[in-house]
Curated annotation (Swiss-Prot):
Subunit and partners: Monomer.
Thermal properties: Optimum temperature is 45 degrees Celsius. Unstable at 40 degrees Celsius with a half life of less than 60 minutes at 40 degrees Celsius and 10 minutes at 50 degrees Celsius.
Main localization category: secreted
UniProt enzyme class: hydrolase
Alphabetical keyword list: Carbohydrate metabolism, Cellulose degradation, Glycoprotein, Hydrolase, Polysaccharide degradation, Secreted, Serine esterase, Signal
Glycosylation sites: 192, 270
EC id: 3.1.1.72
Pathway: Glycan degradation; xylan degradation
Keyword Lipid biosynthesis annotated: no
Protein name: Acetylxylan esterase A
Stated pH dependence: Optimum pH is 6.0. The enzyme is stable between pH 6.0 and 7.0.
Residues that span the membrane, as ranges: none
């Protein structure tokens, strides 16, 4: 009887502890099919919140998409307002939704910390989310992607520059070049009117050097980039489309002034797609302002989930 009582007590404790781990330690076992917060994904120097969507039909060795919200946005808002969770159910990948810690919820794309590999800023926290998710779900490290809108697009370019080792591709919707919002006062979450208004204009080579300086010892492959922008954007002026495409053309060694092709009315009427090479496309949306539509099906093609 004593042995039986001991075993029952042990089993009850094990079940209780397991339930407590699931309840309190969402970082251990996030539920599939819903947006879940992960509270312990490792070092989080800038207090960015992590939310994750694990599909109900999770693939073996799944891919990962990091989907980064806009100013005033949240992980919940981007989860609801973007197509990535629905697409995850179709393709079996995991979606990470970071959430900015700042009032107004813009991202820090301005401090030296965030613009430096392992520098301790927002980019560092997001990179650690990727590392945790890859390990937790045995994800395919060659199928990790990043995308975002507005401030999230700025961070997309920053992530591609600071952690090129983590990402295979990125899609930026209405952003600016990596480093364009640099704060001379080293202020996180700073606004840069000169950049926003399209007045930060330089050469592809100079833009490339800014991106490459964010991880100066890196010599490996870099994520291919697709850049979307509205041609009547009055928040982040359309010149930022040109400058962002210049930056990645410089990084990949493409001649910015001699693209391989330009297609009209694609992916929809009055939009144009310019291709500089296999690693860089730009899509300029005619008549579209800052509120640019996410093209999830096009993203799936760029990320290699569909043909």
């Amino acid at each position: 009887m004593i042995l039986l009582s001991y075993l029952l007590t042990y089993l009850l404790c094990a079940l209780t502890c397991s339930a407590r781990a699931i309840h309190n330690g969402r970082s251990l076992i996030p539920r599939a099919g819903s947006l879940e917060q992960v509270t312990d994904f490792g070092d989080n120097p800038s207090n960015v919140k992590m939310y994750i969507y694990v599909p109900t039909n999770l693939a073996s060795n799944p891919g990962i998409i990091v989907a980064i919200h806009y100013c005033t946005g949240t992980a919940q808002a981007y989860y609801q307002g973007s197509p990535y969770a629905q697409l995850a159910e179709t393709h079996g990948f995991i979606v990470i939704y970071p959430e900015s810690p700042y009032e107004g919820t813009c991202w820090d794309v301005s401090s030296q910390a965030t613009l430096t590999h392992n520098g301790g800023g927002n980019s560092n926290s997001i990179a650690n989310m990727v590392t945790w998710t890859t390990k937790q779900y045995n994800a395919d490290s060659s199928k990790v992607f990043v995308t975002g809108t507005s401030s999230g697009a700025m961070m997309t370019n920053v992530m591609a520059a600071t952690y090129p080792n983590l990402f295979a591709a990125g899609v930026a919707y209405a952003g600016v070049p990596a480093g364009c919002f640099l704060s001379t006062a080293d202020q996180p979450d700073a606004w840069n009117s000169t950049c926003a208004q399209g007045q930060s204009i330089t050469t592809p080579e100079h833009w490339a050097s800014i991106a490459e300086a964010m991880y100066p010892d890196y010599s490996g492959s870099r994520p291919k980039m697709q850049i979307y922008h509205g041609n009547v954007d009055t928040t982040l002026y359309p010149q930022n489309y040109e400058e962002t495409c210049k930056q990645w053309a410089g990084v990949f060694g493409y001649n910015y002034d001699a693209p391989e092709s330009t297609e009209s009315n694609t992916p929809e009427a009055n939009w144009s797609r310019t291709t500089w090479g296999p690693n860089l496309q730009g899509i300029l949306a005619g008549g579209v302002g800052h509120n640019i539509q996410i093209h999830g099906d096009e993203d799936m093609k760029w990320f290699g989930f569909t043909n």
